[in-house]
Amino acid sequence: MLRKVGQKFMKLEIISDDRLSSDGKNLSRVAWELSRTPDDTTPLDTILSIDAPVNEIPSVVMSVECTILEREVFASFRDHVMWARTSRVDAPSEFDVPDYFKYSETMDDIVLLKNRINADMKAGIIQDEYRLHMPICAKTSFTTRLSWRGLIKIYKLYKELAKIDEYYIIGKTELDNKFQLHKYADNYSYVDPIPMLQKNEMVSGKSGPIVTVFQEMTIGLRAQVVRHRNYTIKDNLMEIIKAKDCWTRTLGDKIKISISAEIDFWKTVVNKRQCWIAQYGIWKDIIVVAQEYITIGEQDLPCNKGFCPYTRDAELRHTDDD
Protein backbone atom coordinates (compact mmCIF):
# COMPACT_ATOMS: atom_id res chain seq x y z
CA MET A 1 0.00 0.00 0.00
CA LEU A 2 1.15 3.52 -0.82
CA ARG A 3 2.02 5.45 2.32
CA LYS A 4 -0.90 7.53 3.57
CA VAL A 5 1.37 10.34 4.70
CA GLY A 6 2.35 12.73 1.90
CA GLN A 7 0.88 10.57 -0.85
CA LYS A 8 1.16 13.27 -3.49
CA PHE A 9 4.18 15.13 -4.67
CA MET A 10 4.51 15.36 -8.43
CA LYS A 11 2.77 18.58 -9.41
CA LEU A 12 1.76 19.40 -12.97
CA GLU A 13 0.64 22.89 -13.89
CA ILE A 14 -0.53 23.58 -17.43
CA ILE A 15 1.03 26.85 -18.60
CA SER A 16 -0.24 26.74 -22.18
CA ASP A 17 -2.76 24.28 -23.60
CA ASP A 18 -2.37 23.88 -27.35
CA ARG A 19 -4.75 20.99 -27.92
CA LEU A 20 -7.58 22.93 -29.54
CA SER A 21 -7.80 25.05 -32.69
CA SER A 22 -9.12 28.62 -32.62
CA ASP A 23 -12.63 27.29 -33.26
CA GLY A 24 -12.41 24.78 -30.41
CA LYS A 25 -11.70 21.64 -32.45
CA ASN A 26 -9.09 19.17 -31.21
CA LEU A 27 -5.92 19.56 -33.29
CA SER A 28 -5.64 15.81 -33.81
CA ARG A 29 -9.10 15.97 -35.36
CA VAL A 30 -8.06 18.93 -37.54
CA ALA A 31 -4.94 17.12 -38.77
CA TRP A 32 -6.91 13.90 -39.29
CA GLU A 33 -9.56 15.62 -41.41
CA LEU A 34 -6.91 17.27 -43.57
CA SER A 35 -5.57 13.80 -44.39
CA ARG A 36 -8.93 12.14 -45.06
CA THR A 37 -11.96 12.52 -47.31
CA PRO A 38 -14.65 15.00 -46.23
CA ASP A 39 -17.07 12.21 -45.35
CA ASP A 40 -14.74 10.65 -42.73
CA THR A 41 -16.57 10.20 -39.43
CA THR A 42 -13.87 8.62 -37.25
CA PRO A 43 -14.69 9.48 -33.60
CA LEU A 44 -12.24 11.77 -31.81
CA ASP A 45 -11.60 9.18 -29.08
CA THR A 46 -10.56 6.71 -31.78
CA ILE A 47 -8.15 9.23 -33.29
CA LEU A 48 -6.65 10.04 -29.89
CA SER A 49 -6.10 6.32 -29.32
CA ILE A 50 -3.94 5.91 -32.43
CA ASP A 51 -0.20 5.63 -31.80
CA ALA A 52 0.77 7.85 -34.74
CA PRO A 53 2.26 11.30 -35.50
CA VAL A 54 -1.23 12.79 -35.85
CA ASN A 55 -1.25 12.87 -32.04
CA GLU A 56 2.00 14.80 -31.91
CA ILE A 57 0.18 17.88 -33.22
CA PRO A 58 -1.73 18.83 -30.04
CA SER A 59 0.53 19.66 -27.10
CA VAL A 60 0.72 21.24 -23.67
CA VAL A 61 3.39 23.31 -21.97
CA MET A 62 3.66 22.40 -18.30
CA SER A 63 5.68 23.20 -15.24
CA VAL A 64 6.60 19.98 -13.48
CA GLU A 65 7.65 19.65 -9.86
CA CYS A 66 9.15 16.27 -9.07
CA THR A 67 12.32 14.56 -7.87
CA ILE A 68 15.69 14.89 -9.60
CA LEU A 69 15.44 11.24 -10.66
CA GLU A 70 12.05 11.79 -12.28
CA ARG A 71 13.42 14.78 -14.18
CA GLU A 72 16.12 12.49 -15.58
CA VAL A 73 13.47 10.00 -16.64
CA PHE A 74 11.58 12.72 -18.53
CA ALA A 75 14.81 13.93 -20.17
CA SER A 76 15.73 10.42 -21.29
CA PHE A 77 13.16 10.60 -24.08
CA ARG A 78 15.27 11.77 -27.01
CA ASP A 79 12.50 14.04 -28.32
CA HIS A 80 12.12 15.86 -25.00
CA VAL A 81 11.61 19.62 -24.94
CA MET A 82 12.70 20.86 -21.55
CA TRP A 83 14.10 23.86 -19.73
CA ALA A 84 15.18 22.70 -16.30
CA ARG A 85 15.63 24.45 -13.00
CA THR A 86 19.01 23.04 -12.12
CA SER A 87 20.07 22.23 -8.60
CA ARG A 88 22.35 25.29 -8.76
CA VAL A 89 19.39 27.67 -8.60
CA ASP A 90 18.60 26.82 -4.99
CA ALA A 91 21.15 26.48 -2.20
CA PRO A 92 22.17 22.79 -2.16
CA SER A 93 22.23 22.82 1.65
CA GLU A 94 18.53 23.70 1.66
CA PHE A 95 17.33 20.88 -0.58
CA ASP A 96 13.94 19.41 0.27
CA VAL A 97 12.44 15.98 -0.38
CA PRO A 98 8.82 14.83 -0.78
CA ASP A 99 6.94 13.91 2.39
CA TYR A 100 6.87 10.36 1.04
CA PHE A 101 10.55 10.07 1.97
CA LYS A 102 10.42 12.18 5.13
CA TYR A 103 8.31 9.53 6.78
CA SER A 104 10.42 6.58 5.66
CA GLU A 105 13.55 4.73 6.74
CA THR A 106 15.54 6.63 4.10
CA MET A 107 15.23 9.95 5.94
CA ASP A 108 18.18 9.22 8.25
CA ASP A 109 20.44 8.83 5.22
CA ILE A 110 19.02 12.00 3.67
CA VAL A 111 19.83 13.97 6.84
CA LEU A 112 23.40 12.63 6.73
CA LEU A 113 23.76 13.87 3.15
CA LYS A 114 22.58 17.34 4.15
CA ASN A 115 25.10 17.30 7.00
CA ARG A 116 27.88 16.41 4.55
CA ILE A 117 26.97 19.40 2.40
CA ASN A 118 27.07 21.74 5.39
CA ALA A 119 30.41 20.29 6.53
CA ASP A 120 31.90 20.79 3.06
CA MET A 121 30.63 24.37 2.94
CA LYS A 122 32.28 25.14 6.29
CA ALA A 123 35.50 23.56 5.02
CA GLY A 124 35.51 25.89 2.01
CA ILE A 125 34.81 23.19 -0.58
CA ILE A 126 33.50 24.67 -3.85
CA GLN A 127 29.84 24.25 -4.77
CA ASP A 128 30.65 22.10 -7.81
CA GLU A 129 31.81 19.46 -5.35
CA TYR A 130 29.51 19.72 -2.34
CA ARG A 131 26.34 19.84 -4.43
CA LEU A 132 27.16 16.30 -5.55
CA HIS A 133 25.94 15.12 -2.13
CA MET A 134 22.37 16.01 -3.08
CA PRO A 135 20.16 12.89 -3.23
CA ILE A 136 18.22 12.15 -6.39
CA CYS A 137 15.01 12.19 -4.33
CA ALA A 138 15.49 15.95 -3.81
CA LYS A 139 12.80 18.18 -5.26
CA THR A 140 13.39 20.06 -8.49
CA SER A 141 11.29 21.58 -11.26
CA PHE A 142 11.33 22.15 -14.99
CA THR A 143 9.23 23.40 -17.88
CA THR A 144 8.41 21.03 -20.70
CA ARG A 145 6.32 20.76 -23.85
CA LEU A 146 4.69 17.38 -24.45
CA SER A 147 2.51 16.29 -27.33
CA TRP A 148 -0.57 14.17 -26.67
CA ARG A 149 1.41 11.16 -27.86
CA GLY A 150 4.31 12.14 -25.60
CA LEU A 151 2.00 12.38 -22.58
CA ILE A 152 0.81 8.84 -23.15
CA LYS A 153 4.38 7.56 -23.59
CA ILE A 154 5.33 9.11 -20.23
CA TYR A 155 2.18 7.73 -18.63
CA LYS A 156 2.92 4.21 -19.86
CA LEU A 157 6.48 4.50 -18.58
CA TYR A 158 5.20 5.50 -15.14
CA LYS A 159 2.90 2.46 -15.17
CA GLU A 160 5.97 0.27 -15.71
CA LEU A 161 8.03 2.09 -13.08
CA ALA A 162 5.18 1.72 -10.57
CA LYS A 163 5.69 -2.05 -10.82
CA ILE A 164 9.23 -1.50 -9.52
CA ASP A 165 8.59 1.19 -6.90
CA GLU A 166 5.21 2.30 -5.57
CA TYR A 167 6.43 5.91 -5.44
CA TYR A 168 5.78 6.19 -9.20
CA ILE A 169 2.07 5.58 -8.59
CA ILE A 170 1.99 9.24 -7.50
CA GLY A 171 3.23 10.49 -10.88
CA LYS A 172 1.07 8.05 -12.81
CA THR A 173 -2.01 9.20 -10.91
CA GLU A 174 -1.17 12.89 -11.37
CA LEU A 175 -0.76 12.43 -15.14
CA ASP A 176 -4.01 10.51 -15.40
CA ASN A 177 -5.97 12.96 -13.26
CA LYS A 178 -4.79 15.83 -15.44
CA PHE A 179 -5.40 14.22 -18.85
CA GLN A 180 -7.45 10.99 -18.39
CA LEU A 181 -4.76 9.09 -20.26
CA HIS A 182 -5.90 5.64 -19.15
CA LYS A 183 -8.75 5.82 -21.67
CA TYR A 184 -6.31 5.92 -24.60
CA ALA A 185 -3.08 4.32 -23.42
CA ASP A 186 -3.82 0.65 -24.14
CA ASN A 187 -3.50 1.12 -27.91
CA TYR A 188 -0.08 2.78 -27.64
CA SER A 189 3.15 0.83 -27.74
CA TYR A 190 5.43 0.97 -24.72
CA VAL A 191 8.65 2.86 -25.41
CA ASP A 192 11.55 2.33 -23.01
CA PRO A 193 13.66 5.52 -23.01
CA ILE A 194 16.17 4.02 -20.57
CA PRO A 195 17.22 0.69 -22.09
CA MET A 196 19.78 -1.19 -20.02
CA LEU A 197 23.40 -0.88 -21.16
CA GLN A 198 24.84 -4.30 -21.99
CA LYS A 199 28.37 -5.41 -21.11
CA ASN A 200 29.46 -5.66 -24.76
CA GLU A 201 28.39 -2.02 -25.24
CA MET A 202 30.77 -0.69 -22.60
CA VAL A 203 33.41 0.37 -25.13
CA SER A 204 34.48 3.56 -26.86
CA GLY A 205 35.20 3.69 -30.57
CA LYS A 206 34.47 5.06 -34.02
CA SER A 207 32.42 3.51 -36.81
CA GLY A 208 32.19 5.62 -39.95
CA PRO A 209 30.87 9.05 -38.95
CA ILE A 210 29.68 7.83 -35.53
CA VAL A 211 31.79 8.21 -32.39
CA THR A 212 30.84 6.37 -29.20
CA VAL A 213 32.22 7.28 -25.80
CA PHE A 214 31.73 4.93 -22.86
CA GLN A 215 32.16 6.50 -19.44
CA GLU A 216 31.52 5.88 -15.79
CA MET A 217 30.44 9.37 -14.78
CA THR A 218 28.50 11.09 -12.03
CA ILE A 219 24.72 11.20 -12.20
CA GLY A 220 25.13 14.98 -12.11
CA LEU A 221 27.09 14.93 -15.37
CA ARG A 222 24.63 12.50 -16.91
CA ALA A 223 21.98 15.15 -16.24
CA GLN A 224 23.90 17.53 -18.53
CA VAL A 225 24.75 14.97 -21.21
CA VAL A 226 21.19 13.74 -21.62
CA ARG A 227 19.99 17.28 -22.49
CA HIS A 228 21.83 17.02 -25.81
CA ARG A 229 19.07 15.32 -27.78
CA ASN A 230 21.23 14.29 -30.75
CA TYR A 231 23.12 11.90 -28.50
CA THR A 232 22.04 8.28 -28.53
CA ILE A 233 22.37 7.16 -24.93
CA LYS A 234 22.33 3.82 -23.15
CA ASP A 235 23.12 3.54 -19.45
CA ASN A 236 22.38 1.60 -16.29
CA LEU A 237 19.83 4.07 -14.92
CA MET A 238 17.25 1.29 -14.70
CA GLU A 239 19.66 -0.67 -12.51
CA ILE A 240 19.81 2.35 -10.19
CA ILE A 241 16.02 2.69 -10.19
CA LYS A 242 15.70 -0.95 -9.12
CA ALA A 243 18.31 -0.65 -6.35
CA LYS A 244 17.12 -0.70 -2.73
CA ASP A 245 19.08 2.47 -1.99
CA CYS A 246 17.95 4.20 -5.18
CA TRP A 247 16.48 7.31 -3.59
CA THR A 248 19.56 8.05 -1.49
CA ARG A 249 21.90 7.82 -4.45
CA THR A 250 23.41 11.23 -5.05
CA LEU A 251 24.40 13.46 -7.94
CA GLY A 252 27.96 12.35 -7.19
CA ASP A 253 27.25 8.63 -7.46
CA LYS A 254 28.43 6.91 -10.61
CA ILE A 255 26.43 5.75 -13.60
CA LYS A 256 27.71 3.77 -16.58
CA ILE A 257 26.79 5.39 -19.86
CA SER A 258 27.44 4.98 -23.58
CA ILE A 259 27.12 8.16 -25.67
CA SER A 260 26.99 8.05 -29.48
CA ALA A 261 26.68 10.79 -32.08
CA GLU A 262 28.01 11.92 -35.44
CA ILE A 263 31.41 13.62 -35.43
CA ASP A 264 29.98 17.01 -36.39
CA PHE A 265 27.62 16.94 -33.42
CA TRP A 266 30.45 15.97 -31.08
CA LYS A 267 32.31 19.06 -32.29
CA THR A 268 29.24 21.21 -31.63
CA VAL A 269 29.05 19.96 -28.05
CA VAL A 270 32.77 20.38 -27.46
CA ASN A 271 32.48 23.94 -28.75
CA LYS A 272 29.99 24.65 -25.96
CA ARG A 273 31.61 22.63 -23.18
CA GLN A 274 35.35 23.05 -23.60
CA CYS A 275 35.73 26.39 -21.78
CA TRP A 276 38.27 25.53 -19.08
CA ILE A 277 36.85 28.05 -16.59
CA ALA A 278 33.13 27.43 -17.07
CA GLN A 279 32.68 23.74 -17.74
CA TYR A 280 35.79 21.93 -18.93
CA GLY A 281 36.52 20.42 -15.53
CA ILE A 282 33.08 18.83 -15.43
CA TRP A 283 33.21 17.54 -19.02
CA LYS A 284 36.95 16.83 -19.16
CA ASP A 285 36.78 13.02 -19.11
CA ILE A 286 34.25 12.92 -21.95
CA ILE A 287 36.17 15.43 -24.05
CA VAL A 288 39.49 13.62 -23.56
CA VAL A 289 38.05 10.33 -24.83
CA ALA A 290 36.19 12.02 -27.70
CA GLN A 291 39.43 13.69 -28.82
CA GLU A 292 40.90 10.25 -29.50
CA TYR A 293 38.49 9.97 -32.43
CA ILE A 294 37.85 13.59 -33.39
CA THR A 295 40.26 16.26 -34.55
CA ILE A 296 39.62 19.28 -32.35
CA GLY A 297 41.70 22.44 -32.54
CA GLU A 298 41.65 26.01 -31.28
CA GLN A 299 38.95 26.83 -33.83
CA ASP A 300 36.60 24.55 -31.90
CA LEU A 301 36.91 26.51 -28.65
CA PRO A 302 33.88 28.68 -27.80
CA CYS A 303 36.12 31.76 -27.62
CA ASN A 304 37.93 31.18 -30.95
CA LYS A 305 36.71 34.52 -32.32
CA GLY A 306 38.21 36.46 -29.42
CA PHE A 307 34.98 36.80 -27.45
CA CYS A 308 33.84 34.54 -24.61
CA PRO A 309 30.10 33.84 -24.92
CA TYR A 310 30.03 32.39 -21.40
CA THR A 311 31.71 35.25 -19.50
CA ARG A 312 28.98 35.64 -16.88
CA ASP A 313 28.61 31.88 -16.32
CA ALA A 314 32.36 31.57 -15.91
CA GLU A 315 32.51 34.47 -13.45
CA LEU A 316 29.71 33.02 -11.32
CA ARG A 317 31.33 29.59 -11.15
CA HIS A 318 34.73 31.15 -10.37
CA THR A 319 33.25 33.13 -7.45
CA ASP A 320 31.09 30.16 -6.36
CA ASP A 321 27.91 32.22 -6.77
CA ASP A 322 26.52 29.82 -9.39
Task: Report the location of each language-model feature.
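Family-specific signature for flavin-dependent thymidylate synthase
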Residues: 1-322
